[in-house]
Amino acid sequence: MHPDLSPHLHTEECNVLINLLKECHKNHNILKFFGHCNDLDREMRKCLKNEYSERRTRSREHGAAMRRRLSDPPEEAGR
């Protein structure tokens, strides 16, 4: 099962692959069941996996920065 394939959620590169896969499924109604579009599907899943790992890395970095910010008391300028 794929994640939400809405265009606003993905990079342009992945959107191109998503659209190619959708076109392949549309043009090959029966052959898609016999693996005709599998290469496009693999490439799309690879792209989505890369997006996911990049988002996860950014989120971890952001979380670590927020934890550091909350655990370190701010310097008082007046004293």
Swiss-Prot record:
A motif (Cx9C motif 2) lies at residues 37-47. Residues 50-79 are annotated as: Disordered. This is COX assembly mitochondrial protein 2 homolog. Disulfide bonds join C14-C47, C24-C37. InterPro entries: Cyt_c_biogenesis_Cmc1-like. The gene is Cmc2. A motif (Cx9C motif 1) lies at residues 14-24. GO terms for cellular component: cytosol; mitochondrion. Pfam families: Cmc1. Keywords: Disulfide bond, Mitochondrion. Residues 11-55 form the CHCH domain. It is found in: Mitochondrion. Belongs to the CMC family. It comes from Mus musculus.
